[in-house]
Amino acid sequence: MLLQIAGVCSAQQFSAMVTSLESGEAAFEDGKKTAGWQARSVKNNLQASGADADNATSLVKEQLLHHPVFKAAAIPKTFVKLMVSRYLPGMEYGTHVDDALMAGIRTDLSFTLSLRDPETYSGGELVIEGNDGDTAIKLPAGCLILYPTTSLHRVAPVTEGERLAIVGWVRSYIRSAENR
């Protein structure tokens, strides 16, 4: 299941969140520090820390808990982790599967919320591999893609501009994707 969800935050909330992250207060560091053991060798991006990043991820979490489409599709029990990720030219995240357990908690669904419009950067597509081939996803700012954590995926190299997104993992009340 790949599900695109729009309208996670209001335009005003979204604008304030992105402005706050761009203000320079968010500290970005090597994303390998947050990668699971399987993905560490293929991860080349930056992750934000600090109050602005915490505020952004808290806002997104709160909005998703009240978003009817997200709630119906994910049936969220808990958010395992949310992070602000940034890709500059030359950065990418090679083919990997997200960790099935994070801090001892099962992860069922992964999501990426785009914070940049696709025309503001080149490359940087989220590519999800499947039996029918690859699906390249590059969403407008404010849109989210929800997909099973077990999906083999990658972020294509950014060749120009900056890819900025919030990524997260959800434990559902219902483990099986077929029953969700």
Spans of model-derived segments:
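Non-heme Fe(II)/2-oxoglutarate
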Residues: M1-P76, A177-R180
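Catalytic core of non-heme Fe(II) oxygenases with the double-stranded beta-helix
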Residues: P68-N179
